[in-house]
Each structure stands twice: as structure tokens, then as C-alpha cells.
Regions:
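Short glycine-rich anion-binding loops that position phosphate/pyrophosphate groups of nucleotides
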Residues: 78, 119-121, 147-149, 179
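Short glycine-/acidic-enriched loop or helix-start segments at secondary-structure transitions
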Residues: 125-127, 152-154, 184-185
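Short acidic low-complexity segments
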Residues: 101-110
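Mid-length scaffold segments of soluble, non-membrane domains
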Residues: 110-131
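Iron-sulfur (Fe-S) cluster-binding modules
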Residues: 1-78, 89, 94-97, 105, ...
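A short, gly/pro- and small-residue-rich
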Residues: 127-143
Length: 196
């Protein structure tokens, strides 16, 4: 019996249609039908209170160090985009970092902080240097993710020059593959504290 029905009742419509050609397929279908639903419970990795505390601290430190809100430019130096997804999540309604005065900007000329992801590839070394040079002081640079720190799985690849620190000075590293949005926020806070 499967779900209150005999397995034959589930399999019967498939017979004669060519859908179940071999006994292996038959056995697989029976196994699928006998296996109960297996899921892991939803675990909330971060609490709203922790995000709120870190966000308020970032806002206070930004006011202390810069006298205004923090403006961030994200730079993908050659990543797989896993870290970018976590950084982009900072703007979703759950984190909503705009309420803490964190603003993502399109131009490095308007940025106080660079979030750099991925190992630096040959094609991105010069653009990364120019982005760093265009950023006004205090030029806070945060290497986000394992690949930005030590090239991760891309280490030794032909197109990879090295970690972010080989191209521009790095103030803070944020470990993880990818790091969670809360970990990224903690890294931003640590960077502001080092400049304060």
C-alpha cells in the first residue's frame, strides 16, 4: 500500500504506454512510490534581532567615521556569482540594509567602500585597480568570500592572477563560500571599526 493505494494502481496507467520499458524502471518506480517524503526542517540562520543590532552598529560607525551613510560599490573580480547573490540579498525586504544607511552605488566615485568578490582574473585586474583609484578616501576594501581571500577552487587557473590582496590593499576579509548576508554585514562593521 502506498498512500492508501496499491502500487499497482499507480503503475497500471504506465503499462502499455512504453513509459516503463524495463524491470529496472519498474523497480525504481516502486521504490520512489514507497519512499516517504524526506525533508529537513527549515532553519533560520539569522535572527531578525541580530541583523537589527549589526545594522544599527553599522549606521552608528558610519556616522562616526564618515559623518554620513555608507556608500558601497560591489566589484566582481571573477567569481562564480555565489557571493553576489548573498550581497544582493542584503537589499531584499528581509535585510533591507537601506534602513541602516547602507547604499549600493553604481560608480566608485560615489563609494566609500568596495566589496570585492572572486579571485582576480587577468581581465579584471586593471578594472579593479582603476576602481580602487577612483574611490575617494578612506577607500575601505572588503574581500568577500573564500575566492577573494585565497582564490578558492580557482587557485592555479590560467586566467587567475591571485587574491584581491595581490591587486589592491584589503582592510577586512569575510570568509565563507559564500558568506551569509549577516556575515557580510559583520565584515562591513569590522571594516568601519578599523577605520574609526
Amino acid at each position: 500500500m502506498i498512500g492508501g493505494r496499491d502500487a499497482a494502481a499507480w503503475i497500471q496507467p504506465c503499462l502499455g504506454t512504453g513509459a516503463l520499458e524495463t524491470t529496472v524502471e519498474m523497480m525504481l518506480l516502486k521504490k520512489i512510490l514507497r519512499t516517504p517524503v524526506v525533508t529537513e526542517p527549515l532553519v533560520r540562520a539569522e535572527s531578525e534581532e541580530q541583523v537589527e543590532v549589526i545594522g544599527r552598529q553599522i549606521d552608528a560607525w558610519a556616522q562616526r567615521v564618515l559623518g554620513r551613510s555608507l556608500h558601497i560599490r560591489e566589484v566582481d573580480a571573477g567569481s562564480c556569482n555565489g557571493c553576489e547573490l548573498e550581497i544582493i540579498a542584503l537589499n531584499n525586504p528581509y535585510y533591507d540594509v537601506e534602513r541602516f544607511g547602507l547604499h549600493f552605488v553604481a560608480s566608485p566615485r560615489h563609494a566609500d567602500c568596495l566589496l570585492v568578490t572572486g579571485p582576480v582574473t587577468r581581465n579584471m585586474a586593471d578594472p579593479l585597480r582603476r576602481t580602487y583609484d577612483a574611490t575617494p578616501e578612506p577607500k575601505i576594501v572588503i574581500a568577500i568570500g573564500d575566492c577573494a581571500i585565497d582564490c578558492g577552487v580557482f587557485a592555479g587557473g590560467y586566467g587567475v592572477i591571485g587574491p584581491v590582496s595581490a591587486v589592491v590593499p584589503v582592510d577586512v576579509i569575510v570568509r565563507g563560500c559564500p558568506p551569509t548576508p549577516q556575515t557580510v554585514l559583520a565584515g562591513i562593521l569590522a571594516a568601519l571599526q578599523t577605520h574609526g
